[in-house]
């Protein structure tokens, strides 16, 4: 009974948090109210099912329905362009450019009003590799948001937050998101392995995602894409803060795990300095990252899809965060990236300018090497734009 009361009280608090700010109006307001109604039903579903051994199929289905409705109401961006909903502090600029290796295997997503929460946003960038890499990247992009939403709401239903302990609440919220991300990544990787329409045995994808909830961002990284925050230092200069680790095979903790699992890590003679992951007795697959979804040929030999999950409190000094694939970071420094983005007059074009700069840098710094796919999301925390916009452009 006590636990039942805690869950009930929690959901009263949770559902209250879906209230819409006055600045949201028009179509955005109508869409958010529709999502809020859906969220209430999903929350009640979890509350009624607590303690039972039933699957979370109902919750997943509801989360996927929410995603479809968000897309219908232009709250989700999946191509190059930008999204800025009236009443939101967020402005997200997205751009992706195909490299010189064939089809573009990068993809991205921005979901404003994530989980029907007016103060939440989800964004992610995915870098596929292998023969089916572009299909794997898109599959993970489609699966991860709804799976994360489902696991987050289910974890919330099983957690009691003390409203009198603000510091404890912040600590618990992080662990709720971390637990949700760990469950989600395991589920998405398992689902991908069972999905027969995509051959992911020798193909995979990285995944770098961020959830902004109020003034907190939660960052989860699988692979070698990177998130860099731009913040004002005490002396007024804009400085970069790298929020993620590039999970490359040469990192001590990564190579140790791979070697313990009988995998191998070494560089090819024609690629000095580029460490890759190899099977015990074969010169394949030669992955340049130590964590990824898919790539089941080497999952038993040290490659994992476990995310590193971190969080950060956003202050007035923090201006924006850049999420980009290694096609950017191979030729652009963290400092260069934030300078390019901050000096772009039109925030909506920031990602495009960064991607174009990286493409030029490839020609100068990597002559004779085929340019990688280049993709970036620039998420501004304190948007000065006040308009309802979701604009897409061709890649």
Give a label for each model feature.
Residues 2-395:
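PP2C/PPM-type serine/threonine phosphatase catalytic core
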